Amino acid sequence: LGDAYHTALICARLNLADGIAAYEQSLRDHCRRSAKYAYDALETVGLGMCAMLAALVHDMGKACERFMEYLEAAFAGKDVRRGSVNHTFAAVRFLLERYWEPAEQGSVRIWTAEIVAYAAGAHHGQFDLNGPAGGHGFEHRMTKKDICYQEARDNYLRECADIKELDAMFDAAAGEVERFFETVSDNIDIAEEDEECDFWTGLLARLVLSAVEEGDRRDTYEFMSGKAQPECDVGNDGWSGLSARLDEKIAGMECRSEINKARREISRMCREAAQKPGGVYRLN
């Protein structure tokens, strides 16, 4: 790599300063800040390392020359298609290649690899592992051609996080997943096909994904706006205030079209129904 490309490689995004000059955020900084925020989101429930690992590698696919060319073209105002450079598959492929071992089928490490890979790969949209029309989400991401995977992986491991650090994180994440399943039920056997296990695994994967999205979106906002997002610890006492703010926001929205009028009426009915005592109700 030449010096010019080596410098550009670490750039995750570009922005305007004072409307004229560009300033950069390195891929390393973005990944690590996202990982820190993701960790903070789930640390209190014992899943911080799962979230941190997924967020740390989520943008691995950006560590290639093709993405830098796309970023610079978009910044220059050229006609580029958003999302035309695939950057979400690389993390999935890396995690499954590195940590998914067929000999360990049904083990905690297999489940951890899949949960973290899904959370990293779905940060711009969830995907089906087994779609209604066939196909497998992981297999598709493992075999997709022309995504600059090897280039992105090698550059990422050199610039952002080395393999030793990632291996240690994965070991810690596997410990969290094991404790999670021990906590939720004594009747779940992750080595067996079990609907209850699948249910909890789906919830866990979405929880880790939500932390990745929180870290990614928060760091992106802070970089693009130049403003630090204040820490917010809502707690139980904060829900009434948040509910009031939501009601105020909704009340200020226009309600002119028939569909929006219907939506508002449905919301009103739901709010009234929430005041009823607990029980089994029929939707009609």
Protein language model regions, located:
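Pre-Walker A adenine-sensing motif
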Residues: 264-276
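Walker A/P-loop
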Residues: 277-284
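Intrinsically disordered, low-complexity segments enriched in small/polar residues
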Residues: 17, 276-277
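A conserved cap/lid and substrate-binding interface adjacent to the catalytic center
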Residues: 239-242, 259, 263
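Accessory nucleic-acid engagement/destabilization modules that flank
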Residues: 1-249
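Dynamic helix-loop-helix/coil hinge segments at AAA+ ATPase domain boundaries and subdomain interfaces
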Residues: 23-27, 251-262
